């Protein structure tokens, strides 16, 4: 059973996050291993396994990029383990330049420039994210998979920039 079905939700990117949360709580109560403490060993094991599946489904569906990757996996794109990389050389060059800029900001310990950099990367991420949503809604799976690969780069860059921000603020 796929994670969307487990949660009683349609298999699409845009979800009702409140319904997702409520269903998670219901499933957790229903399959909590403590409820099966007096059951047979097989029942206890099944409850632990079901609870683990519910937790994994929850983590996957509530995180936007993980949810997109999972939805794509249902359509034959295994982005989590694939060896495909982004082949868009202009995008890759831009990423290299952004990484170099982040390194320069770190060397200079320039908080103002870092703040501007983070905003710029967030805007780039948001723009691509919106494109991905449209591609998933339109079921253009190849294009959506390519956009998700690019979003991974931007997500890692944003994370690195935010870590640098924490590091600079700790000084």
UniProtKB/Swiss-Prot annotation:
The keyword Lipid metabolism does not apply. The keyword Transmembrane does not apply. SMART domains: DnaJ. It comes from Escherichia coli (strain K12). One of its GO terms (biological process) is [2Fe-2S] cluster assembly. PROSITE patterns: DNAJ_2. Transmembrane segments: none annotated. InterPro entries: DnaJ_domain, HscB, HscB_C_sf, HscB_oligo_C, J_dom_sf. This is Co-chaperone protein HscB. Pfam families: HSCB_C (PF07743). Gene3D superfamilies: DnaJ domain (1.10.287.110), HscB, C-terminal domain (1.20.1280.20).
């Amino acid at each position: 059973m796929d994670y969307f079905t487990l949660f009683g939700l349609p298999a699409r990117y845009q979800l009702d996050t409140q319904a997702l949360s409520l269903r998670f709580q219901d499933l957790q109560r229903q399959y909590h291993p403590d409820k099966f403490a007096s059951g047979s060993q097989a029942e206890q094991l099944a409850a632990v396994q079901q609870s683990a599946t519910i937790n994994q489904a929850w983590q996957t569906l509530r995180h936007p990029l993980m949810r997109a990757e999972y939805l794509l996996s249902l359509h034959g794109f295994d982005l989590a383990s694939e060896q495909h990389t982004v082949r868009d050389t202009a995008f890759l060059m831009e990423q290299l330049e952004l990484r170099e800029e982040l390194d320069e900001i770190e060397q200079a310990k320039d908080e103002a420039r870092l703040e501007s950099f983070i905003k710029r990367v967030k805007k780039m991420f948001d723009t691509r994210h919106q494109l991905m949503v449209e591609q998933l809604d339109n079921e253009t799976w190849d294009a959506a998979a390519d956009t998700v690969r690019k979003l991974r780069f931007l997500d890692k860059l944003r994370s690195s920039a935010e870590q640098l921000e924490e590091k600079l603020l700790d000084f």
